[in-house]
């Protein structure tokens, strides 16, 4: 009977996720995932992008209260912008909350001045992430006071939604963008594993408002997908599938694979064979200096193997405990069968 686990174990898996910060403020990152099966780059990239832009928790200003102002179609004496324009500007204020409960923050300004988000008194539970953001322009000897309500939520919530129904008179609901992720783009390129050059490499660019680091945002999105997809698994793993998992080894079972599975060039493969390097475990225990002392083994072959090992999250000079095991052939066959 075909092992169920072959459906997922036979697929190539990414060996790591590489994060590269691309801004001084740590809110933009380039994320590279490789290698992936053909088509998986598009599948994962699209799913991650949708979740990142729709499902993460964040904070936003949901309503404002200005003395003597009852609706957004009013004008405030001494303020260049009308209330509707101010609301548009306030929607652009990015906030971070350290508590789950709503908080009221206050703004008090005396003109002449340009009123910015940094003038808001927030207390310890709320932080303004873009303090230079302009709210309005205040004339000389004029005063502006305002209370702003901050809440935690997700997605984009219109002011017409249910939370606006219970607001007291004089408090104006505004549209709230809770999502801490500002933009997500991705592209898929080819990458190489051994002699196969058409595996997928997923490259994502994620920008947040500073509430979360991009690495954390990506991790949360992956966890959301994991929780949603878990319900689709409606079968029990077979006992033979579990056996390989429960047999404890002091090293990765991948080291039991033969080096000829790496699909090396003929020259490199012959050098390893002549030096009696049979298993990947034999290979990674060697240092680069050891390899260069191998007859007919040059720098080109070394770089070829280093590149392949790196894609598998392996390297030369690794400390592999209890290698080689006494029953290496039996173990190698067992794990080979589990993959098949």
Curated annotation (Swiss-Prot):
Single GO term (MF): protein dimerization activity
Single GO cellular component term: DNA-directed RNA polymerase complex
Gene3D superfamilies to which the protein is assigned, alphabetical: 5' to 3' exonuclease, C-terminal subdomain, DNA-directed RNA polymerase, insert domain, RNA polymerase, RBP11-like subunit
Keyword terms, alphabetized: DNA-directed RNA polymerase, Nucleotidyltransferase, Transcription, Transferase
Reaction it catalyzes: RNA(n) + a ribonucleoside 5'-triphosphate = RNA(n+1) + diphosphate
CDD domains tied to this protein: RNAP_alpha_NTD
Enzyme class per UniProt: transferase
Ranges where the record places region Alpha C-terminal domain (alpha-CTD): 251-340
GO BP, one annotated term: DNA-templated transcription
Residue span of region Alpha N-terminal domain (alpha-NTD): 1-236
Function, in words: DNA-dependent RNA polymerase catalyzes the transcription of DNA into RNA using the four ribonucleoside triphosphates as substrates.
UniProt subunit comment: Homodimer. The RNAP catalytic core consists of 2 alpha, 1 beta, 1 beta' and 1 omega subunit. When a sigma factor is associated with the core the holoenzyme is formed, which can initiate transcription.
Free-text note on domains in this protein's UniProt record: The N-terminal domain is essential for RNAP assembly and basal transcription, whereas the C-terminal domain is involved in interaction with transcriptional regulators and with upstream promoter elements.
Protein family: Belongs to the RNA polymerase alpha chain family.
Name of the molecule in the record: DNA-directed RNA polymerase subunit alpha
Species for this entry: Rickettsia canadensis (strain McKiel)
């Amino acid at each position: 009977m075909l092992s169920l686990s072959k459906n997922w174990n036979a697929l190539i898996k990414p060996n790591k996720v590489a994060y590269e910060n691309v801004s001084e403020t740590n809110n933009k990152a380039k994320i590279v995932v490789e290698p992936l099966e053909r088509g998986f780059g598009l599948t994962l990239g699209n799913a991650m992008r949708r979740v990142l832009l729709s499902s993460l928790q964040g904070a936003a200003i949901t309503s404002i209260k200005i003395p003597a102002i009852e609706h957004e179609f009013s004008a405030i004496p001494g303020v260049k912008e009308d209330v509707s324009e101010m609301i548009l500007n306030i929607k652009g204020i990015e906030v971070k909350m350290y508590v789950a409960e709503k908080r009221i923050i206050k703004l008090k300004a005396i003109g002449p001045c340009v009123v910015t988000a940094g003038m808001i008194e927030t207390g310890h539970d709320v932080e303004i992430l873009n303090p230079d953001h302009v709210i309005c322009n205040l004339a000389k000897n004029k005063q502006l006071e305002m209370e702003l309500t901050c809440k935690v939520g997700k997605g984009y919530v219109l002011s017409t939604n249910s939370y606006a129904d219970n607001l007291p008179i004089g408090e104006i609901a505004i549209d709230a963008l809770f999502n801490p992720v500002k933009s997500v783009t991705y592209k898929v390129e080819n990458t190489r594993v051994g002699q196969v050059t058409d595996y997928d490499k997923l490259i994502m660019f994620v920008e947040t408002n500073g509430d979360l680091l991009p690495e954390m945002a990506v991790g949360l999105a992956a966890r959301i997908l994991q929780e949603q997809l878990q319900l689709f698994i409606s079968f029990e793993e077979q006992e033979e599938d579990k056996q390989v998992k429960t047999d404890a080894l002091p090293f990765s079972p991948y080291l039991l694979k033969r080096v000829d599975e790496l699909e090396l060039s003929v020259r490199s493969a012959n050098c390893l064979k002549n030096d009696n390097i049979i298993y990947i475990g034999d290979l990674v225990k060697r240092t680069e200096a050891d390899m260069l002392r191998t007859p007919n083994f040059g720098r080109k072959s070394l770089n070829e193997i280093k590149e392949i090992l790196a894609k598998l999250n392996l390297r030369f000079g690794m400390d592999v405990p209890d290698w080689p095991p006494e029953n290496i052939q039996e173990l190698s066959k067992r794990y080979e069968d589990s993959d098949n």
